[in-house]
Design a protein with these regions (language model features):
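Cyclic-nucleotide recognition modules
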Residues: 49-104
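A short beta-strand-loop-beta hairpin characteristic of the jelly-roll/cupin
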Residues: 35-48
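Phosphate-/nucleic-acid-contacting segments
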Residues: 120-145
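A small-molecule sensor/coupling module
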Residues: 88-129
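Regulatory nucleotide-sensing modules
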Residues: 1-38
């Protein structure tokens, strides 16, 4: 039987798991503790996500081979992470449809949350919606794109 776990590691609060812009060859499942993901633009750090036990992160770089979109760090002392490398990830996606569906569901959930935040921020700034935002709303309301 194939071993799915590259390794389990424990992190201290504030310890960097991966840095924004670095290549991604693994994803992580939070066994215990918490992780935060941030991005830094023009010297300003912005919180993208805070996650806890049972959640996963780092999968985007495995799916699209792009560099990491944010910096992940432990948000609690004793945060334990299970690391899956690219080979194990691809094996699970191919052999375990439920795993692939979980990844897709979570990605869709995250996209919808970001879309909602974008539209909320756009409304607060008094700006007009872009055509892409109009299409997103139409799609969510069952309209044709």
């Amino acid at each position: 039987m194939k071993s799915f776990v590259k390794f389990i590691r424990t992190y201290r609060k504030g310890e960097i798991i991966f840095a924004e812009g670095s290549p991604g060859q693994e994803m992580y499942v939070i066994s215990s503790g918490a992780v935060k993901v941030t991005t830094t633009k023009s010297g300003k750090e912005t919180l993208l996500a805070r996650m806890g036990t049972g959640e996963f992160f780092g999968e985007m770089s495995l799916v699209d081979a792009a560099p990491r979109s944010g910096t992940a760090s432990a948000d609690e002392d004793g945060t334990r992470l299970v690391e899956l490398d690219l080979d194990r990830f691809l094996y699970l996606v191919q052999q375990q449809p439920a795993f692939a569906l979980t990844i897709m569901h979570t990605l869709c959930e995250r996209i919808r949350k970001r879309d909602a935040l974008y539209l909320e921020l756009l409304g607060k700034s008094g700006g007009e919606q872009s055509p892409a935002a109009d299409e997103t709303q139409a799609g969510e309301q069952g309209g044709a794109l």
